């Protein structure tokens, strides 16, 4: 019997030693070369490198130039031309004989302006202006979407750091459990089943710690990718938990001023302007042009005087497409369909935003309430674990009671961590929906 106890005791000691070695070999929470970032720094870095944000800024550049081109349509077009030629036979230029090999110069300057285009230029400008507004709203929307995604990865990494600490505390409690069971087994107050069960619980605690560390490394790598850094990134936590925001007027303001709503409304205005552009094909186009040219033996840079022949022309033209095989009708019908779709998308965007806001606000209030509940549960579970451990040590309780109490404490701590960061993530999601800080 004593030999059996010594064998069991030796196995338990071996398990404790291997656990201690594994704990000594686990990496430190922050390595010397690991980048540490605050949430504000992480968001700033992400806004610089995320492709969606780069694309949104590029769309603004394109929209700005589209608007500039639409404005330029109201200005005259100016063209300058100049040429020089010679031939191997004699000729006459402006009635004068020209010997072979002599250069003859032609120079011209033309200015043209559309006087009336059936309001096409005005509708194009309105379309470009609405497109620019949509691009601005897209940038704002992407800024908050990227910020929310970065915040989620940031808080997920912090949560996994806390879960590693929970797993470490679980491992320490498992060590205490196995030590108590060994002491009781040596004193004859516990059975071999108790020591073996405690050994299994210790192994499970070690596995939980390894899994928590692996999950933490994955979370830190995902955060590093989000902010454009190779390797792992350590987030710096904020010690203060923000209070619940005032959401009294949040929904009404979001349905009018949220970036996604503003973008959809701007695209609707752009589609409306495009319909007027297509209708301009039914109206005539009136243009005016003025041309001055010079031809002769005098170089262009010496002026238009001398023997050159100067010609000045002024022209007004009218063009009216009366029928083009129903192409105008097809274009007009297509733009009208796009306008109907844009109006439906604007209305659906508001409905979708309202539904998402309801979901995220529910998550926000629920997670905030869970913070208080889980904190109380941790206090109660810790006290219950202490009492149960003391009862087991004195022989008034069973190992099963102790394992149950310790499992309840571990789960309560996990729930507390998840509740805190679920609240922070839900808050970031609400900010992304409404387009401003809470």
Label for each model-derived stretch:
Residues 25-35, 81-113, 124, 236-247, ...:
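Small/polar, glycine/serine/threonine/aspartate-rich low-complexity segments that form flexible
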Residues 1-5:
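N-terminal secretory signal peptides that target proteins for export/translocation
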Residues 7-18:
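Bacterial N-terminal signal peptides
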Residues 204-229, 376-436:
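Short segments within alpha-helical structural elements
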Residues 54-58, 71-72, 101, 115-143, ...:
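Sec/SRP-type N-terminal targeting helices
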Residues 142-255, 360-363, 367, 408-409, ...:
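Periplasmic alpha-helical coiled-coil/stalk elements that build and connect Gram-negative outer-membrane
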Residues 250-295:
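Acidic, glycine-rich loop-and-beta core segments that form the ion-binding/anion-interacting portion
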Residues 23-81, 89, 231-269, 321-322, ...:
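Bacterial Sec-pathway N-terminal export signals of envelope proteins
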